[in-house]
Amino acid sequence: MNKENVITLDNPVKRGEQVIEQVTLMKPSAGTLRGVSLAAVANSEVDALIKVLPRMTAPMLTEQEVAALELPDLVALAGKVVGFLSPNSVQ
């Protein structure tokens, strides 16, 4: 997995006794984005991110965990998601 796709959370997610300090984002396929507007994802709309991030994170975050993320962590994840939408020639 590409180390550039690993985000270290400023405020780790606590899941029971487990603490998630890093999240790896996997490049989405068309199916990953089903049910959300591509424009909404590209614009980093929170509702769209809450829907798609659980489908592309390892360990898999739940929608509730994504909704509870601190803003700097959500922005860091959103930046990677938007980066995946750009063609390789633009990156």
UniProtKB/Swiss-Prot annotation:
UniProt cross-references to Pfam families, sorted A to Z: Phage_TAC_7 (PF10109)
Task: Report the domain of life of the source organism.
Answer: Viruses
Query: Which InterPro entries does the entry link to?
Result: Phage_tail_E/E
Q: Name one GO biological process term.
A: viral translational frameshifting
What name does this protein carry?
Answer: Tail assembly protein E
Per the entry, what this protein does is: Promotes tail assembly by creating a scaffold for the tail tube proteins. Tail assembly proteins E and E' would wrap the linear tape measure protein to create a tail assembly scaffold.
The gene behind this protein is: E
By sequence similarity, the record places it as follows: Belongs to the mulikevirus tail assembly protein family.
Task: Give the organism, scientific name.
Answer: Escherichia phage P2
Record keywords, A-Z: Late protein, Viral release from host cell, Viral tail assembly
